[in-house]
Amino acid sequence: MDVPRNENSSDFPIRCFSCGAVIGHLYDEYKQKLSEGKSPKEALDELGIERYCCRRMFITHKSVIKELSRFHGAVG
């Protein structure tokens, strides 16, 4: 079953792994601010992300959906 996905945020966590704060809805806006030339610090400050654990979620996120999709159906 093919599920339509937003390529920008489809694999970004909905909640922070450490504190559980809901952050997933902010990822697209974060990426937009970066594309406008803002630094990660400026973007996160403007979004109101203050906790270090939540900031880490944005700064260290690496999308691997395309790489993993090559193996869809290969196991089994």
Curated annotation (Swiss-Prot):
SUPFAM superfamilies on file: RNA polymerase subunit RPB10 (SSF46924)
GO biological process: DNA-templated transcription
UniProtKB keywords: Cytoplasm, DNA-directed RNA polymerase, Metal-binding, Nucleotidyltransferase, Transcription, Transferase, Zinc
Leading EC class: transferase
Cofactor mode of binding and number, as noted: Binds 1 zinc ion.
Cysteine-cysteine disulfides: none
Cofactor(s) this protein cannot do without: Zn(2+)
Record-level Gene Ontology MF annotations: DNA binding; DNA-directed RNA polymerase activity; zinc ion binding
Residues annotated as binding Zn(2+): 16, 19, 53-54
Family matches, as Pfam families: RNA_pol_N
EC number: 2.7.7.6
Cellular localization per UniProt: Cytoplasm
GO cellular component, one term: DNA-directed RNA polymerase complex
Catalytic activity entry: RNA(n) + a ribonucleoside 5'-triphosphate = RNA(n+1) + diphosphate
Entry function: DNA-dependent RNA polymerase (RNAP) catalyzes the transcription of DNA into RNA using the four ribonucleoside triphosphates as substrates.
Assembly: Part of the RNA polymerase complex.
Assigned protein family: Belongs to the archaeal Rpo10/eukaryotic RPB10 RNA polymerase subunit family.
Protein name: DNA-directed RNA polymerase subunit Rpo10
Organism: Archaeoglobus fulgidus (strain ATCC 49558 / DSM 4304 / JCM 9628 / NBRC 100126 / VC-16)
Lineage per the UniProt record: Archaea, Methanobacteriati, Methanobacteriota, Archaeoglobi, Archaeoglobales
